[in-house]
Amino acid sequence: MPHLAELVANARAAIEDAQDVAALDLVRVEYLGKKGHLTLQMSSLRDLPVEERPAAGAVINQVKQEVQEALNIRKEKLETDLLNFRLAAEKIDVSLPGRRMENGGLHPVNRTIERIETFFGELGFSIESGPEIEDDYHNFDALNIPAHHPARADHDTFWFDAKRLLRTQTSGVQVRTMHSQQPPIRVIAPGRVYRNDYDQTHTPMFHQVEGLIIDRDISFTSLKGTLHDFLTNFFEEDLQVRFRPSYFPFTEPSAEVDVMGKNGKWLEVLGCGMVHPNVLHNVGLDPEIYSGFAFGMGVERLTMLRYGVTDLRAFFENDLRFLKQFK
């Protein structure tokens, strides 16, 4: 079968000429595929006398096996050469210093919340949380802000329907705590709150921490001492602090708390007051027996003052150049 010998010689030459696995696979298909040259030799057996077919078929199968072995050997060599090339090209000098691991850090708002929680935790306050989708009872009614109360107009509220809203303050957590626990109560409620406002000093979502103490014989003096110590600890300096008379529906008397800035001007930092008797009535506590104080602070506001940030929106823009300053 001289034609068969020529095919084998051509196949071996094509195998040796293949420079990569893809080219080698094309050679395999050309000679051993369904329509390959050697495969088609099997169909030519029908032209031989019956007595010659077994011997001729055995020769063709032997040749196909030899070509397949040559393909396997060439493929193994090509893969080995490729691996050696990659190892040489991609080798690592282990004596070089490794890549420095990029250290992350807490977001400045989270750092402030953690600092507040640590201070009040050392005073025996527990940390409570509540739903951000609130009902009007816990957000308004229980806090001495009934329907049509003018104070409701001060809250640019995101309403879902007539009864459900995105909470405008974390005071609802305090209401739930007073319903579920008996005095003495010491609790702070950090969390996200929502109001429809957006400018350099306001965002639609921001963070608050509100605090509450309910017990016997709680006085405004207790409130002043607690907040003065907190502000001194938070800003890490002996600040000049003043309490200005103010109005909140849920406290009486009420006050705004200011600190003296480095520029000689007063800066408002939080609001506070003695818990209003109506609020105590609403949660089933007798104001003749129990009293308490409450306070609330904007976390972003305190963070801006502590770190000298002038634009509140920078906290929410995820600019790494800004955030890396707080590591």
Curated annotation (Swiss-Prot):
The keyword DNA damage does not apply. PROSITE patterns: AA_TRNA_LIGASE_II (PS50862). The keyword Aminoacyl-tRNA synthetase applies. It comes from the Bacteria. CDD domains: PheRS_alpha_core. One of its GO terms (molecular function) is magnesium ion binding. Mg(2+) binds at E252. Binds 2 magnesium ions per tetramer. Disulfide bonds: none annotated. It is an enzyme of class 6 (ligase). InterPro entries: aa-tRNA-synth_II, aa-tRNA-synth_II/BPL/LPL, Phe-tRNA-synth_IIc_asu, Phe-tRNA_ligase_II_N, Phe_tRNA_ligase_alpha1_bac, Phenylalanyl-tRNA_Synthase, tRNA-bd_arm. Its cofactor is Mg(2+). It holds the Pfam family tRNA-synt_2d. GO terms for cellular component: cytoplasm. Keywords: Aminoacyl-tRNA synthetase, ATP-binding, Cytoplasm, Ligase, Magnesium, Metal-binding, Nucleotide-binding, Protein biosynthesis. It catalyses: tRNA(Phe) + L-phenylalanine + ATP = L-phenylalanyl-tRNA(Phe) + AMP + diphosphate + H(+). Its main location: cytoplasm. Coiled coil: none annotated. GO terms for biological process: phenylalanyl-tRNA aminoacylation. It is found in: Cytoplasm. Tetramer of two alpha and two beta subunits. Belongs to the class-II aminoacyl-tRNA synthetase family. Phe-tRNA synthetase alpha subunit type 1 subfamily. HAMAP family: Phe_tRNA_synth_alpha1. This is Phenylalanine--tRNA ligase alpha subunit. The gene is pheS.
